[in-house]
Amino acid sequence: MKKLFLVGALALFGAMNAQTTGNFKIGAHVGLPVGDLADSSNLNIGADVAYVWDLAENFKAGVTTGYSYYTGGKTYSYILPGYGTVSVETEGSGIIPLAATAEYAISPNFFIGGDLGYAFFTESNGGDSGAIYYQPKIGYKFNSSELYLGYKGMSKDGNSISSINLGYAFTFGK
């Protein structure tokens, strides 16, 4: 799976490299974990970088990466017969996504978009340390900036990690 994704990413880089106009973006996001992840994490925070090319009048596509951290710190207490009460505190974890990104302008200021790729977990337990990564989003552009709302998710072997995020990005270039 990783090799197939890498070949696809290289093909995307090659196809987009022929385009003449592109923009570099840098941003940050904050989010609330949802689903099962909400039981062990209170917050998702991170930074993003992307490079997108203008492929059509209202359509951009490119590559994105960054770092996203899911906080831990929730404490659970269990009563074990013969041992008393045992408390366990959850630990935080981070991801580094590598994804293709696309954006379609539905008006001069509003856009819909998404990211699709692979997320590498920064904490590995000796096994395969990653998952399929996806993030549909909707946003508003103003001047050289954008504000977006997204649903970030990672999925592997029927398990998923997800959060609802609010992000801000600054665009360098046009």
What residue spans do the PLM features occupy?
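Cleavable N-terminal export/targeting peptides
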Residues: M1-N23, K174
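Membrane-embedded beta-strand positions of outer-membrane beta-barrel proteins
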Residues: I26-A28, V63-T65, A100, I112-G114, ...
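Transmembrane beta-strands of outer-membrane beta-barrel pores
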Residues: V30-D36, I45, W53, Y67-T71, ...
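Flexible, solvent-exposed loop segments that connect beta-strands
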Residues: L32-S41, S68-G94, F120-G130, D157-N159
